[in-house]
């Protein structure tokens, strides 16, 4: 993972890019104090960085691409345009629910297990480099397609209220929950989803 000085540069850029002076919580950000004293929004231990920035009046684009120390980013309920966390191989959790984003790049996030990105304006989402993803929550977007073929570890999938016309559920023996209501699905084969305990596929075009 990148060292503390490099992490500090990433955070200073994040602060500038998203209007840090207008954040609700910004204690000691961009000061010379140790990262451990940058308020409760920053946790940096043993070379691993977690950020808690939900409902903090962030505006603009979050660009943490290449921040190899990042393991968790929670930034729900802000006013953002785009989030780029590509090339963050340790990132395990991203919550950007209800941020208004139209772009999200998680390429190279090989450790990602939990992705919550519902209530945004996403029209595409690339998940080919997220093989360990177990929870995908992406309802209320504008997705016309959703390729989860690389995400064989999925247990919980919520893709409700999008524009999906097909959803390939082949080989999903481990899937426990599926919410896909409010799409344009005409066919949905769940015959191989032997672990499913909760399903809602209403308001589609299924026959």
Model-derived features: positions:
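Consensus "Asn ladder" position of solenoid repeat domains
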Residues: 56, 78, 99, 120, ...
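Canonical leucine-rich repeat
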Residues: 61-62, 83, 104, 125, ...
């Amino acid at each position: 993972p990148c060292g503390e000085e490099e992490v500090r540069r990433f955070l200073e850029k994040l602060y500038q890019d998203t209007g840090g002076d207008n954040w609700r919580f910004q204690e000691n950000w961009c000061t010379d104090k140790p990262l451990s004293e940058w308020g409760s929004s920053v946790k940096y231990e043993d070379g691993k960085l977690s950020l808690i920035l939900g409902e903090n009046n962030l505006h603009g684009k979050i660009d943490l691409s290449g921040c190899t120390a990042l393991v968790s980013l929670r930034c729900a309920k802000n006013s953002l345009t785009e989030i780029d966390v590509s090339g963050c191989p340790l990132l395990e959790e991203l919550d950007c629910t209800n941020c208004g984003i139209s772009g999200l790049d998680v390429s190279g996030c090989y450790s990602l297990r939990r992705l919550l990105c519902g209530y945004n304006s996403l029209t595409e989402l690339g998940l080919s480099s997220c093989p360990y993803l177990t929870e995908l929550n992406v309802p209320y977007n504008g997705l016309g397609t959703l390729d989860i073929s690389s995400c064989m570890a999925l247990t919980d999938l919520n893709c409700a209220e999008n524009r999906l016309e097909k959803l390939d559920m082949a080989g999903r023996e481990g899937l426990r929950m599926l919410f896909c209501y409010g799409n344009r699905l005409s066919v949905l084969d769940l015959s191989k989803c032997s672990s499913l305990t909760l399903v809602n596929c209403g308001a589609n075009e299924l026959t």
